[in-house]
Regions:
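Extended, charged coiled-coil "stalk/tether" helices of large eukaryotic trafficking and scaffold proteins
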Residues: 95-99, 114-117, 123-130, 140, ...
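Short, charged, amphipathic alpha-helical segments
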Residues: 134-136
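Extended alpha-helical solenoid scaffold regions that build the rod-like backbones
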Residues: 1-129, 221
Length: 280
């Protein structure tokens, strides 16, 4: 039964199927449901897996368990087997992420799916088979994927704001900064309006991180320079978004809505090439 499951994972006939918005893939849902249910019978499976040859040591990342790499022989056979099966799943998901044309969406996909894997481990008997070190390691990896998403998707928006938002500059320069920020922010929101973050806690964490990087700086710049560019009425002629509007639009992200932020603006998918790996 377990051999059949691993074979199904390895073959994965839908390897090029993409989930809209970068959400959790059906393969992830099915595989983790199966493994979490299987973990409930660990007391029976221990003796069975003890007779199986262990996965190749080179295929398991360093620090994969609480037990040091040099002492893998002490890890229960069932723990090694569960870790191996999840690793096979993660490698398949890594390959699926490569099929997204938008690199930032690839990282949303990786974040969502790894977060689901970790969540299922934490809320099942897999937690006791894999150990706290495994959980900590993969939680950190999910956060890194989210950080990579923020950098790729919102880096241009953040870069449009000055490092010192209260520095004295000319009205023309202030007007141009506000204009560029509004344009890049609108483009980013438009591009990502269908993106999904499935886990509510993770969704809020990403929004809060973006708000710290964008809303706070933009608000400080906006409040400092709106009078120098001619007052509230004048700034509204080229600033589509006030600071509170930026916060509101960020709050609406990651639910997979198809509503447009504004009239569609052209934006090309990133051609940035990458290797996205769950493995170390």
């Amino acid at each position: 039964m377990v051999s059949d499951f691993e074979s199904t994972l390895q073959k994965d006939s839908h390897s090029k199927s993409l989930v809209r918005g970068g959400g959790v893939h059906p393969l992830t849902l099915d595989a983790m449901n199966y493994l979490s249910n299987l973990a409930d019978y660990s007391h029976i499976l221990e003796d069975i897996f003890a007779e199986w040859p262990p996965p190749p040591r080179s295929s398991l990342p360093e620090s994969y368990f609480d037990t040091p790499q040099s002492d893998d022989s002490q890890a229960p056979a069932i723990s090694l087997r569960m870790a191996w099966l999840i690793l096979v799943l993660l490698c398949k998901l890594d390959g699926k992420a490569e099929h997204y044309k938008d690199v930032s969406l690839s990282y949303i996909f990786l974040t969502n799916n790894l977060q689901h894997v970790v969540s299922k481990v934490c809320t099942s008997n897999l937690r006791y088979l894999l150990g706290e070190e495994w959980i900590t390691r993969h939680e950190a990896k999910a956060r890194q994927f989210a950080t990579n998403y923020e950098r790729l998707a919102w880096g241009k928006v953040a870069a449009s704001l000055p490092e010192n938002p209260t520095a004295v500059i000319s009205p023309a320069a202030a007007k141009e900064i506000i204009r560029k920020f509004n344009l890049s922010f609108e483009e980013a929101c438009q591009k990502q309006r269908t993106f999904v973050v499935s886990d509510p806690k993770l969704r809020d964490e990403i929004k809060e991180s973006l708000a710290r990087k964008l809303v706070a700086v933009y608000r400080e710049f906006y409040d400092t320079h709106r009078l120098t560019v001619g007052g509230e009425r004048n700034v509204g002629s080229y600033a589509r978004f006030a600071p509170e509007d930026v916060g509101n639009h960020l709050s609406d992200l990651f639910f997979g809505t198809t509503e447009s932020v504004s009239s569609p603006s052209s934006s090309s998918s990133s051609s940035h090439r990458r290797r996205l790996r769950f493995r170390s």
